[in-house]
């Protein structure tokens, strides 16, 4: 039934109020009132009629209002808007451009150029806007009148329903208004390349192409520089007006003008056309207006009429012709088809309408002058996006990766200070800045000074992944190798008598040794620069800080035969055991000495007199040979020593008086006995030398405890034994007189699989040997074990002395002896039959009862050493030749030797598996082989020129280790091959039956360090002692926690996210915007009706180049805390654990207990552990720091500029055009690093395939939870990601170049933002494969000098270094 007649007819009562103001306000107000009048006046109970009317009116209203609001925005400057009702029916739309190439008329012999016309087509990009609202069933009933009952309440409810509908419709219309602006802003952003990309492309393109690799390399270098310079420029420039104006000029002149010159355009109030629009955030706009830009006008005239699309027949015609808006096909014909005048007369009305004055209105605008251009400055953040859940497109995010060098060591020319009074320590204290740095200071968010120390790396290196090398061994053996010279990589089983071992070795290996220096010797003589050269063929085998990779004999179980069998080779790996075995090129001598100097501060130091006395003995080429015979005769036996105490005292005193040197310092047993028993018999100065030696040994032993944390026994061994090699019973002293060490070696846990080979036999311990039972030609496993006075019923199969006795012996021989001898001494076997024969071959003149013992061998004929009593080849003659004065009673004590004798020198080969702290599935089958001599002696300075004693008469050279293989001793031994004499000076000739370099606990780098060190004996002993700390997860935990430098540094990688404020500039009329007919869809539901509104849109770029450009203006705020949170691998899936469960549990609990990333409890059964949620957060999301093991010799200058954390360039920045160039660039170290052509890499432990860093962070191995989400290093190590980024950068350069070049109609060209721009803006470090250094220093004083802006602040101070910021954030205050 019809509504009551009291309602006013039509729309009179609302429309009668005439609107005032501009045309835009008139349209808006009229639209609102007309819609309200319709709902207030129409009453009907026919739903279909209401639906039809409602749909039609709603569509008209939305079109009008959305266009009106859009024109008020600065975005409309960049658009040519055209109504196109039939857009929804269009299959494909194209726009054609005719581009005229400019010519220059020239004189001279140049060919005459003809005009060139290029044609370009572009395809319309289809889009749509959608919105929806719903009407409840009851509201529909009220609107149609079905629910009216004639009461006033029902009429009030109807009015409320009408008002609510109007509010819903207004909200939808508001969505369309904002959606139009948002859609156009996204359209402009999609075609706007970054300024950092566009500027270099325009400068370096040659006819739109990069003709050569050189041009591309130049372009990429400029691209990286441009990105750092132009990013965040408004924030970095501060108040420098000229710099910001120049940056804005670059921004507004980098684009190409539109080919469209529309008749209707924006202009200021004086009629000057607006050249473009600059869209940014409210904060940047306000700053530009306040400080840098001059407002030319506050109002603008904008058009309010648009072109329209019409259909005539089956053809769809563009609305843009010669840059003007058209209304019909007649205008198209006039401009395109050149129709006759009579044809145009029929459309005169249309043409008159076209030529009429444009309809414009005046709106509020900020028009500014940038250079010679008039620009509409716009900020839509508050006007469009406020109170919506849609982020502002010009507020983005950027991820930047930073790199920090931790624990590196300055090269020699960088270890200096400006003058002595600069940054001096407190009086009386050592200079800590001369020690190797172990920490790093930098600024975090809010200018916090943060610290990173090596302790923070425990979550990375104190993890079983350190020992997981199965993938590396399998990878490097992919191609066959040849074991050309296996010396040093092959261990033979001892066989036969020890006296012939050296000669048999030389005879069997002569041909192999004659090939020249072996790898492990040559590497020790390289500098860091030489080692990193691409021509170093063995660089490919330096993959891991804790393992040696080498070419050995394949499929041979060690120990093997006397010589390796012929056959193929294989790349093998052995645990390096201690950090002293790191190559000298990567851990140089200067670093080791500096570390030793640091450890010696505040600890025991030998007196200069002690050093002079001991050094003099080791360098004395006239050292009395009879002392060696006495040493062998005593054979470490405490009872024999006490029996010969008078003779020993006189020998020591006589030698001291002659030379001021200390005798018997080549045998620690004798040194210890002398301190214990001869305190009152020797001169005080002489006795002080021996006491000082023992005290120093004890101090070095205490050093281990200083750097070991308390903890439970693991694998049956104390923590100190797992931490330091000298405390590990698996290593024997090179010279042993008793069998205590052998018994403790055999008593180790069964998992260490300890074995001892005594001359090819199992050891058998014997307690007594005298002249009646001695067998000097014995060839079995019998070993004498009676060096201490003991009970008669004491067992022979257990140690007699505490473990410290063996430990002190090892420290003395492996630390003090190399520090004094510098590798010139040599171990030797003893011919005991000749020794005893000589010592017993003497006649002592009888002294009558009551007479005093003769004291002067020169004047007293009764003295046994009087010339009249000397006989050739007797012990008396040897005393005389050595100028040693002893009396008759002392010589008579030699008779006791017949009751306690040694039989022979036995070569021992001991083997053991890694300890519980290093035993994993990868290392379980590895064996370490070390040699030792039972009943051998240590020869000090060579005496081969002394012909009073036949060389080899009493001792035969038998080097047990490279530290004790002096070249002069070895090369001058009887029957030494002359062809090997020169080789012996470089290569330590140790028989394979006593070990091999790659299988020894102590290897050639330690030997070379002792030879080359310029440090004094005190510092060198501490340096050597520091080099014997182990490299295992458990050992490194102790060292890092207690502040010991582990011998290698770290590259710290951290990724931070920053919220950025961006700037967009677009040329005038650079985008055609097509608006289709609004469509309303109705969907019935149980509770009402849903209305979905859809309007098709389309757009096409109107330029023959880039007409828009974007730039990152400043940082709004960092999202992350820019902090020092260390990574914890125990949160990931992890490598195979330690085989000893107790050790695995202890290590995990110890690392997690002190780590801020410790897993939350309880631990999940499956998947990764979760990070505990803390109660609060202040500076932002935690940024995780990851650690890449790096040699301390890595050039610190590598980190002063953007660099790849792997140590070698990667990705499309440097790669060539060939297939596989990207992979070759990453892993082929036979080629130089393109970023540093003078080297192949800065870190071979991370840049090579299957290296330690590669195994940790390369996602291809699926280890330790390495993922782009959890790991900032992932993108630098994963080849698939790097290849993808390479292709991305290639495409970015190619497509940007083709866009700037002349295009033809052969293909549809859209000048869109090239693929890869998003990566360039959001993750430039991944795209460039470079991380940026930030301001950091190993010394806080250097950091403060950089903060205070000190002019020419130095970058180094002794071993400390300062790195300046070289990132895009340089100059920003965060």
From Swiss-Prot:
GO MF annotation, one: structural molecule activity
Keyword Plastid found: no
Main localization category: virion
GO CC entries: host cell nucleus; T=16 icosahedral viral capsid
Key words, A-Z: Capsid protein, Host nucleus, T=16 icosahedral capsid protein, Virion
Top-level taxon of the source organism: Viruses
Family: Belongs to the herpesviridae major capsid protein family.
HAMAP family named among the record's database cross-references: HSV_MCP (MF_04016)
Subunit architecture: Homomultimer. Makes the hexons and eleven out of twelve pentons. Interacts with triplex proteins 1/TRX1 and 2/TRX2; adjacent capsomers are linked together in groups of three by triplexes, heterotrimeric complexes composed of one molecule of TRX1 and two molecules of TRX2. Interacts with scaffold protein; this interaction allows efficient MCP transport to the host nucleus. Interacts with capsid vertex component 2/CVC2. Interacts with the small capsomere-interacting protein/SCP.
Protein name, as recorded: Major capsid protein
